[in-house]
Amino acid sequence: MSASHADQPTQTVSYPQLIDLLRRIFVVHGTSPEVADVLAENCASAQRDGSHSHGIFRIPGYLSSLASGWVDGKAVPVVEDVGAAFVRVDACNGFAQPALAAARSLLIDKARSAGVAILAIRGSHHFAALWPDVEPFAEQGLVALSMVNSMTCVVPHGARQPLFGTNPIAFGAPRAGGEPIVFDLATSAIAHGDVQIAAREGRLLPAGMGVDRDGLPTQEPRAILDGGALLPFGGHKGSALSMMVELLAAGLTGGNFSFEFDWSKHPGAQTPWTGQLLIVIDPDKGAGQHFAQRSEELVRQLHGVGQERLPGDRRYLERARSMAHGIVIAQADLERLQELAGH
């Protein structure tokens, strides 16, 4: 699937139509209807919001991973209530999003009761944008922080070989009078999916994103993908955050570190088999003024000092456009999706 439809014939589909199409694709290619529901909504949401590196661009990777037997598309997550503020989920070698969905209501109940709750997911495959995992909590007035480790492709600061994954972190918080503050970011200098897109489109990357197989700086995306590696953002600072993600998303949850799984016997596998941690906070338990109002005051001050666009603003604008006018997809991509759905 292409990530851009510039200079290509396009078609427009509604958000519900895209969800339905993707759902049928996942079922045809080996997931249960329940898993298909969750994955289709996640993928369609990314496409709707302009997060093209995690929208329909990801479908071939999902399907090749399913076909290889690497991930169980019919896995039923096992939710374990292990403490007043702690929930564990064994994803049973399935996708991470259904594991989160299975535990969400219990996690929210615990957060509202104790003021904070932790969800530790292990044995999971996360192949999607991370912001959809935290946004629903922010919409319910909660603060959420999530992190997931991925496959080895990032050289730690000062090291000679890759060890970490891109290891993204997502944050969501309610805001009075506006959309929730929601963003995610890779702890690598650039997301791995954006490198793949640049390679397909024949574009050079900005300097400082990665190295080739000899450890030399390169702006060629294919050199990074062909035996090279990404760099952490911000040098030692991003490297330290990536290490934190490994410890919390894998070490704490019981999932694999980014370097611990081996998919060599599953040709076509692309989904990292690792872990995920979520921390959910009920801000009403905090002191002072209403948290959402304080969030709005911070936003007002940011605008006052000249920051015109906040993290997530572009995504919300694209969402509004897509919901009003439909999601624009390259005609060739839509036809391919319809073929995959069995049309």
Swiss-Prot record:
Is inhibited by the substrate analog pyrrole-2-carboxylate, and by 2-picolinate. It catalyses: L-pipecolate + NADP(+) = Delta(1)-piperideine-2-carboxylate + NADPH + H(+); L-proline + NADP(+) = 1-pyrroline-2-carboxylate + NADPH + H(+); N-methyl-L-alanine + NADP(+) + H2O = methylamine + pyruvate + NADPH + H(+). Its EC number is 1.5.1.21, 1.4.1.17. It comes from the Bacteria. It is an enzyme of class 1 (oxidoreductase). One of its GO terms (molecular function) is delta1-piperideine-2-carboxylate reductase activity. The active site is at S53, H54, D194. Homodimer. Catalyzes the reduction of both Delta(1)-pyrroline-2-carboxylate (Pyr2C) and Delta(1)-piperideine-2-carboxylate (Pip2C) to L-proline and L-pipecolate, respectively, using NADPH as the electron donor. Can catalyze the reverse oxidation reactions, albeit at a much lower rate. Is also able to catalyze in vitro the NADPH-dependent formation of N-methylalanine from pyruvate and N-methylamine; can act on other alpha-keto acids and specifically uses methylamine and not ammonia for these reductive amination reactions. Can use NADH instead of NADPH, although with much less efficiency. This is Delta(1)-pyrroline-2-carboxylate/Delta(1)-piperideine-2-carboxylate reductase.
